[in-house]
Design a protein with these regions (language model features):
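Conserved RecA-like P-loop NTPase helicase motor core
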Residues: 619-630, 681-792
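Metal-dependent nuclease catalytic cores that hydrolyze phosphodiester bonds in DNA/RNA
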Residues: 1-78, 108
């Protein structure tokens, strides 16, 4: 029987943790502050103190061989010659309330390390010391207990005996899973064209010899071939051969998680003996069963019954779920179990994930530096990553590593705090003044065009943007300064220093006044400050600082221009990663931006008959900003020609809501007999579903939907058959020119001379190709794609078209378009 690998912390916390979930403010970032203070204490301990000592030992309980391993915070020999295991804990608990028996898990960790080290070194006795560091006062409290090795071994053996049934359950499951997955058959009678090739690529990547940074694969496969099954099936087969312990299926949006759930359900339906556990992780805000009056999770034991006593009941819930045989733990199943056992569904999903084979969730569970799953990704593991809709990852990753902070947050906090003097009020005023001076500096460097409106600061004084008044602080050299926006390559330390100084008094106030009326506002401020300070610690040559003056406000953004090193580090936590999408063109762009320049990239051709796709372009129309007014009527006429060619459902995609609205108003005025539907901004899940329901099969009347490229209907929407028979794409999808996009352009110009491509052309064309992919979803589908922009005829754009667009026809005018559409539909 193979040894059961068991981290010390997992063993101890699983068996001994008790009590409630309590998310009240504790005054420090546990992950970052705890690690920093550990290093501080370890360094202060001197040369004879061995820090972060890796320990591993073999033990047996209930016939199960265990490998127990972990890192002891410190090991040293005291003046009496006794070996001491030091367990360091950072706490916000007041020093007077820190007790020796405050948390049994703390002693247990030290005792297990003592057992491992004592046997390894042949010791007869040793001490365990708990070192508590109080983060507010810097007080250090130490407690020491004396043990014989026999006592420590007995303690460890007792823990293992308690854990043995869980280990036996998991070992039996892994054996059953291995047999099941190694014999897993493809769940359809035959592969669709392209599916076998894609599955083969993914299988080879997952089963390749492990490397330090993991194997990377980029797969571009046409919409409609069944990509989800084509990547899931081979990855599961790889796990069946022993290549990979868990599979993480990562998506850009919740709506695409259902595709993975459905694929796994199909596998279960085709194989009644399939041994597979899958869990879908959903944001806490969406699954909370007991939100507060404002609809937010209230994770406090006195407010939420699902948080109160959570750790006393969660293992009972886990046992019931793992033994029920279904293996499918989606949002609904977790909610049902949470209600049955009175446990938090969000935390239950996280705890259940350690016992599951497939984990489905958002990108941020792997890539976000704040919310990634530390239980899996703080160190490398035998994980397989499937990254769906990978064309979305560059922008999502940039957002994850960026941060913003506004002067108005300081103003609102001061207002919430009210009158009176305090250390916090002084720190707030200093930070507010620094941002006021920063706003003056920005307005001086980059006055807004035509701005003459007087701006009032918090003291009631007024100044004019761009006035000659000399700011009291100096910003770093500007790389860009125009119309109220300044970009700097260096960090604006003069703004960050007062925010850093604000942290301690803000923490003290939040801890001292948890019931104050201003607590919520100041807690929001605290998190905003921490977010920008964390980003400043990551800040390097891949970032730029953006300062924007708007009225009396100043916005500071630390923008991640190039997320490649951070994405690379995240992917390195696993054995293999397959990043796939219908649109990864050009592949070199995505490999570079996502930190995988040497990765294998494959592009599969469309298996669908070319004659089923009518593909036309009207290059006589220019949608450039300066020609937009002139383009509105020709676009309306072209859309009318498309929608009148055959009764059915159509979509027209635009680069912006404003442009969409202009054309829609003109279209409905001139073609009132054609039914229309407009995508509104900010649609929730219900609004999205209602929009799509209008695209019914076998329509008796024509419906033309107006949507936005890159939005919720421009990708990830499956309207097969006659639910959608045509789409028009207005423009080449270029992002709006902005200071941010210009900084991206400059950055990549300096990197490789392709700044316009990286910042504008390639992201824009990705939106175009995604929108066009809504039309043909199956072998039987037939439909039309109409491109409206003269740039589609330029080689820089045309070379980005997929190979199955070879038959694209460029037409002179709407009259010729009507003729071609009639021929296509045979009417």
């Amino acid at each position: 029987m193979p040894a059961f690998r068991l981290p010390v912390r997992q063993l101890v916390e699983f068996l001994l943790r008790t009590g409630s979930i309590d998310s009240r403010f504790t005054g420090f970032d546990r992950a970052n502050e705890g690690a920093r203070i550990h290093r501080k204490l370890q360094k202060a301990a001197g040369e004879g103190y061995a820090a972060e000592v890796f320990l591993s030992g073999e033990r047996e309980a209930a016939g199960i061989p265990f490998t127990i391993e972990g890192r002891a915070d410190g090991i040293f020999t005291d003046e009496a010659g006794v070996t001491v295991i030091d367990e360091i804990k950072t706490t916000a608990v007041p020093a007077d309330d820190i007790a020796e028996d405050m948390n049994p898990c703390h002693w247990a960790q030290g005792m297990v390390y003592g057992a491992l080290y004592g046997r390894q070194q042949g010791l007869e006795k040793l001490d365990v010391r708990l070192t508590y560091y109080q983060i507010d006062t810097d007080d250090i409290l130490r407690f020491v207990r004396h043990f014989t090795l026999e006592e420590l071994e007995a303690f460890l053996q007792d823990l293992l005996e308690q854990y043995a049934p869980w280990a036996q359950r998991q070992l039996a499951w892994k054996e059953q899973r291995g047999v099941s997955l190694s014999a897993l058959d493809f769940p359809f009678p035959a592969y669709r064209p392209g599916q076998r090739a894609l599955a083969g690529e993914v299988y080879r990547a997952c089963t390749a010899a492990p490397s330090k940074s993991g194997v990377r694969l980029f797969c571009q496969a046409p919409t409609g071939i069944g990509k989800t099954m084509s990547v899931l099936f081979p990855a599961l087969r790889a796990i069946g051969t022993g290549c990979g312990e868990k599979l993480f299926y990562l998506t850009a949006r919740n709506t695409t998680q259902s595709a993975a759930e459905d694929a796994i359900a199909r596998l279960r339906a085709s194989d009644s003996k399939l041994a597979l556990r899958s869990v879908t992780l959903t944001a806490k805000e969406k699954v909370c069963l007991h939100p507060d009056a404002e609809g937010h999770p209230a994770c406090l034991p006195e407010l939420c019954p699902y948080a109160n006593g959570y750790y006393d009941r969660v293992n009972t819930a886990l046992k019931a779920l793992l033994d029920d045989g279904t293996g499918r733990f989606d949002r609904a199943a977790l909610a049902d179990a949470a209600k049955q056992f009175t446990v938090c569904p969000f935390e239950l999903g996280l705890d259940l994930s350690e016992w599951c084979d497939v984990i489905i969730g958002d990108y941020n569970y792997l890539f976000d530096p704040v919310v990634h799953l530390r239980r899996f990704f703080d160190s490398a593991g035998d994980w397989l990553f499937l990254v769906d809709e990978a064309h979305n990852l560059p922008e999502r990753a940039r957002a994850m590593y960026s941060a913003r902070f506004c002067k108005s947050s300081l103003t609102e906090a001061k207002r919430a705090l009210g009158r009176g003097k305090s250390t916090l009020k002084t720190a707030l005023s200093k930070a507010d003044k620094a941002f006021l001076e920063g706003r003056k500096a920005v307005s001086t460097l980059a006055p807004r065009r035509g701005s003459t409106v007087a701006e009032e600061d918090d003291s009631g004084q007024t100044s004019l943007p761009g006035s000659a008044e000399t700011p009291a602080i100096e910003l770093p050299a500007a790389d860009y300064a125009q119309d109220g926006t300044v970009f700097c390559k260096e960090l604006p330390s003069a703004l960050l220093a007062p925010l850093r100084a604000l942290t301690a008094p803000l923490q003290d106030w939040l801890e001292a006044d948890p019931d104050a009326e201003a607590h919520a506002a100041l807690l929001d401020l605290y998190f905003e400050v921490q977010d920008i300070l964390r980003a400043s610690e990551r800040y390097d040559e891949h970032f730029a600082a953006q300062l924007t003056a708007r009225g009396s406000d100043l916005e500071l953004q630390l923008l991640c221009l190039d997320p490649s090193p951070f994405v690379d580090a995240s992917l390195s936590a696993g054995r293999a990663a397959a990043l796939f999408s219908a649109t990864l063109t050009p592949p070199g762009y995505y490999r570079t931006v996502l930190g995988c320049p040497e990765a294998r990239a494959v592009a599969l051709e469309s298996p669908f008959p070319a004659e089923n796709l009518g593909l036309y372009c009207l290059p006589s129309i220019s949608t450039r900003y300066r020609q937009r007014d002139a383009s509105i009527r020709p676009i309306s006429d072209a859309l009318a020609a498309l929608a009148s060619s055959r009764v059915g459902n159509y979509l027209a995609f635009f680069p912006s809501y404003a442009y969409l609205r202009q054309v829609w108003e003109d279209f409905t005025a001139h073609y009132p007999d054609i039914g229309t539907l407009v995508q509104e901004s900010g649609l929730d899940d219900a609004g999205r579903a209602a929009f799509l329901e209008r695209f019914s099969p076998c329509p008796e009347k024509t419906l033309l939907g107006f949507g936005v490229m890159g939005g919720i209907f421009g990708e990830g929407v499956d309207l097969a058959g006659d639910r959608l028979i045509g789409c028009a794409i207005v423009g080449v999808g270029l992002p709006q020119v902005s200071p941010r996009q210009e900084m991206l352009r400059r950055y990549y110009d300096a990197q490789n001379g392709a700044g316009f491509d990286y910042a504008y052309r390639w992201p824009g064309m990705n939106k175009v190709l995604q929108a066009a992919g809504r039309v043909i979803r199956t072998q039987e589908d037939k439909g039309v794609v109409l491109l409206l922009d003269d740039r589609f005829a330029q080689s820089e754009y045309a070379r980005l078209f997929p190979k199955h667009w070879r038959h694209l026809e460029y037409l002179r005018d709407t009259k010729e378009l009507k003729k071609k559409l009639a021929e296509f539909w045979g009417e």
